[in-house]
């Protein structure tokens, strides 16, 4: 069993602009994102913490760290997925998010799961 396949987590983000909660005239843009986390490795692994890097359209960077996601620290068996929805607020109509989840495998090995960069954009920001 190679370590490359042993500790593997797939992360799929799906962002969405929330117009009814946004107020563009006051530089307030609200986004929701649904994240699917799947254990594609060979051992059970628990998500223990997160690290987000959020960049707005002015290249202002905000880093967010915390335990778990939405108050949970899910333990994922091989082949199992966990999905959650959360949100972010920007002062610009476009931005990006990326980061990592800190994971601990059942055997005590610590590893990171990459959250691929995704775009947060109000519909008019892309035209």
Curated annotation (Swiss-Prot):
Domain called ApaG: residue spans: 3-127
Gene3D superfamilies recorded: ApaG domain
Annotated disulfide bonds: none
UniProt feature coiled coil, ranges: none
InterPro entries found in the cross-reference section: ApaG_domain, ApaG_sf, Uncharacterised_ApaG
Signal peptide region: none
One record GO biological process: error-free translesion synthesis
PROSITE patterns associated with the record: APAG (PS51087)
PANTHER family the record matches: F-BOX ONLY PROTEIN 3 (PTHR14289), POLYMERASE DELTA-INTERACTING PROTEIN 2 (PTHR14289:SF16)
Classification via NCBIfam families: PRK05461.1
HAMAP family from the UniProt entry: ApaG
Protein name as catalogued: Protein ApaG
Source species: Dechloromonas aromatica (strain RCB)
Gene that encodes the chain: apaG
């Amino acid at each position: 069993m190679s370590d490359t396949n042993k500790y593997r987590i797939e992360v799929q983000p799906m962002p969405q602009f929330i117009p009814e909660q946004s107020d563009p005239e006051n530089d307030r843009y609200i986004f929701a994102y649904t994240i699917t986390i799947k254990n594609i490795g060979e051992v059970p692994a628990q998500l223990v913490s997160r690290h987000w890097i959020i960049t707005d359209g002015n290249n202002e960077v905000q880093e967010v760290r915390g335990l778990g996601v939405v108050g949970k620290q899910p333990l994922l068996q091989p082949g199992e997925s966990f999905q959650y929805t959360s949100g972010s607020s920007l002062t610009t109509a476009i931005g990006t998010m990326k980061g990592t989840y800190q994971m601990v495998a059942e055997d005590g090995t610590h590893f990171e799961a990459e959250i691929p960069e995704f775009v947060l954009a109000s519909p008019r920001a892309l035209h």
